[in-house]
Amino acid sequence: QSGNSNNFTVAGGTLTNTEDCPSNVFCTLNPLNAVYISFLQGNNTISGGNNGTDYSYIGSTIGASSGKYYWEVKAADLAEIDQVGVALASSGFSNIGNSGGLQATTFGGKGFQFSNGNKVGDGSQSAYMGGFSEDDIGMIALDLDNNKITFGRNGQWSNGSGGADQTYANST
């Protein structure tokens, strides 16, 4: 009931009280604060990503502080989209020129680089799974309950040589 007496009247039938409990909800890319980027296909596809000198950052529409998550990213344009992973929401996702990408300690980020397959984060990057080719699928499994993130390519988790069961600890 409205505190201002702005109430609806049921003309026929009955109302069903439902709790807001969404299931099967899918994350999309969040266009707020993104620069140099065009969003396509319901914010599931991007074009652009840099202006030659600056990184652009894109958050998602679902934030997380606990739980387990999995998503995939298709490498459609390796020249434009270079790093994929996670970063602390408190770092902000607007364009930050010459920031150093996810490997910059500013973002608390962890991820991988499409061009060479390096893992990035903690202020550095290192060889991990080899470079991606166009249409390869990057895989990210984030386990915030156990503080781990795992990366892979085309259905295979990486251990630094393309093998299995590699985790990248301290994801938060």
Task: Name each model feature, range by range.
Residues 1-172:
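PRY/SPRY (B30.2) beta-sandwich protein-interaction domains
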